[in-house]
Design a protein with these regions (language model features):
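Short, conserved beta-strand element in jelly-roll/cupin
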Residues: 77, 82-86, 95-115, 158-159
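Conserved short histidine dyad/triad with adjacent acidic residue
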Residues: 61-68, 79-96, 134
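Histidine-centered metal-chelating micro-motifs
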Residues: 89-92, 110, 128-130, 134-141
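Short acidic-glycine-tyrosine-enriched beta hairpin
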Residues: 103, 115-134
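Double-stranded beta-helix
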Residues: 2-12, 137-182
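A short, N-terminal "cap"/entry segment at the start of jelly-roll beta-barrel domains
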Residues: 1-76
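A structural connector/turn signal
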Residues: 80, 90, 99, 119, ...
């Protein structure tokens, strides 16, 4: 049986085009947004609708602000975004209820995960790929140390239609200790 074919107008297709110069970046809306080591700008390119039933530790992977502003507003089983950060910056340890794949576009990035109480790390460069399964505590950080003032870009792809992010108990404890969350 052949796959169904649809026709779309140029205007309909334009709603599915995201020009980077037109995408608004956000630096808030996540539990760790005000932590000095977690400062970053997130761009919601495809999908990332707000998840149902969030609490302080559970949120959209792009944060509340960016989740409201997808450049391409679809729910078709995956979400795509970018993170821009300076060296030493990136999210605190967290997990997702779906797969998350990281692809550095520029710079060097450390991608870490927690196993048996310690962090393991791979350092990736442009166009390298790492794919974390659901439930693995993970984080990433710009590691382009030879360019201390430069922001670099990482693409991330997350499965599902309304994926959730949850910060680790240690991350939430540190955020509470700093007075950044209740």
């Amino acid at each position: 049986m052949p796959l169904p074919t649809i026709r779309v107008t140029r205007d309909e297709m334009r709603a599915r085009v995201a020009l980077f110069s037109e995408i608004e970046g956000f630096d808030g809306g996540l539990p760790d947004s005000d932590h000095p080591d977690a400062r970053r700008t997130l761009y919601n390119v495809v999908g990332f609708q707000p998840p149902d039933g969030s609490d302080a530790a559970t949120t959209s992977p792009v944060g509340a602000k960016a989740a409201e502003k997808a450049a391409i507003k679809i729910s078709e089983g995956f979400n795509l975004g970018y993170c821009k950060a300076r060296p030493g910056k990136g999210p605190m340890m967290h997990n997702h209820d779906t797969n998350e794949t990281f692809i550095p576009m520029t710079g060097r990035w450390e991608c870490s995960w927690e196993v048996d109480g310690k962090a393991e790390t791979f350092e990736l460069g442009p166009h390298d790929v790492i794919s974390f399964p659901p439930g693995v505590q993970r984080r990433f950080m710009n590691a382009t140390w030879d360019e201390p003032d430069a922001e670099h870009l990482m693409m991330f792809v997350i499965g599902g239609d309304g994926p959730k992010a949850e910060f680790s108990p240690d991350a939430m404890a540190e955020l509470r200790d700093r007075g950044l969350v209740d």
